[in-house]
Amino acid sequence: MHNIHRRNFLKAAGAATAGLVTANIALNAYASSVAPKPQAGKSVIGLIAPKMDVVRVGFIGVGERGFSHVEQFCHLEGVELKAICDTHQAVLDRAIDHIVKQNRPKPAVYTGNDLSYRDLLSRDDIDIVIISTPWEWHAPMAIETMESGKHTFVEVPMALTVEECWQVVDTAERTQKNCMMMENVNYGREELMVLNMVRQGVFGELLHGEAAYIHELRWQMKEIDHKTGSWRTYWHTKRNGNLYPTHGLGPVSQYMNINRGDRFDYLTSMSSPALGRALYAKREFPADHERNQLKYINGDINTSLIKTVKGRTIMVQHDTTTPRPYSRHNLIQGTNGVFAGFPNRIAVENGGFGQSYHEWDMDMQKWYDKYDHPLWQRIGKEAEINGGHGGMDFVMLWRMIYCLRNGEALDQDVYDGASWSVVNILSEHSLNDRSNSVTFPDFTRGAWQTAKPLGIVGA
């Protein structure tokens, strides 16, 4: 969506920086939000919505990410694009033009102010809503969507505070509606192959994972009045921690069956100095430019360590500032071997192709031939044609619609979205307390102990 309250956001960022003086108050509030809460309704683990012959879709936010979803949905069978909402007319026009050119009916349009999405939610001919807006709108919009009787699919992260995570979870339980945070990386070809290999025991008992979002995005600071950088830049002045943990953490969590037999227990976090964005602003903008008036407090590199209840460890890193190649790490280590991404490589002690585990096997084709995931075997070629981060976006959306039309549970639920997203705020709490460990809330309220593990999902 459009640059919502950007000036006010800047003021809030300054207030948040000043508020670090009262970190103990924040930590006390965090402690109370970790404590178990009364269940708002029946657990939604394994929730199956009634089958839908046709899935009727509404979109809140059709800017950069939202328009990508519109493009992908136009390639899916069994869907109707009923309505779109945004505060920026240009992106609405682009979305309408694309939908009509794909020989689909023109959708209803909602715009005018920041709350126009509520008019879209008031419709009774929409089954699911896709939310692709600035981060601060994700939780409020997800909550209102479920309360309007619709299933919710929200971009990452799902929420920005522990309390918001609880509110989204409680709403899903109370309304018995799906709320899936759309972690697309879980549907990448490599990630799904590794999930298949893990479930078949190739790596033995899992011990350790490494996840990251390492993506140099300083150039987004030049997006001043519109696009992602017009609002995302300010988060680097508002928080110090892992701002965006889910892309790397989602797949590793599913490898380890987090919330399905294991769960995150506690986290410790630390950040490097925050230098890169101020240096970039000084180099790329005039001295009196607003980008040079900001105080960037988010460390250029954040590293967090997570311990699970079963004793496994996960390293999670965030870096969108330093000049380096893209990586999500995507490492999973077990008692029999390891997979690591960027570049993809494997080493196993038993069950490999004759290569010593002291050396990396970089030839992925033979591993694909043996372990390529059923989803990619079925729709991989179509996904590669339609694109979307190498096809993972298409596979994710295809799978979502398949589950809704065939009466199956989604692969990611509201507890996953909350557990992966809350790393954002927990990393900040740990940093504010000299990197001491902080406890994860159990958003499942104990149900993780009996939840069915995520299998090798198919179609």
Curated annotation (Swiss-Prot):
Signal sequence range: 1-31
Necessary cofactors: NAD(+)
Post-translational modification: Predicted to be exported by the Tat system. The position of the signal peptide cleavage has not been experimentally proven.
GO molecular function term, any single one: hydrolase activity, acting on glycosyl bonds
Residues noted as binding substrate in the record, renumbered to the chain: Y213, R232, Y244, P245, T246, H247, Y326
The EC number(s) this enzyme carries: 3.2.1.-
Keywords, in A-Z order: Glycosidase, Hydrolase, NAD, Signal
Root EC class: hydrolase
Cofactor binding notes: Binds 1 NAD(+) per subunit. The NAD(+) cannot dissociate.
Binding-site positions, NAD(+): E64, R65, D86, W135, E136, W137, H138, E155, V156, N184, Y244
Alphabetized Pfam families for the sequence: GFO_IDH_MocA, Glyco_hydro_109_C, TAT_signal
InterPro entries linked: Gfo/Idh/MocA-like_OxRdtase_N, Gfo/Idh/MocA_oxidrdct_glycsds, Glyco_hydro_109_C, NAD(P)-bd_dom_sf, TAT_signal, TAT_signal_bac_arc
Function: Glycosidase.
Family according to the record: Belongs to the Gfo/Idh/MocA family. Glycosyl hydrolase 109 subfamily.
UniProt name for this protein: Glycosyl hydrolase family 109 protein
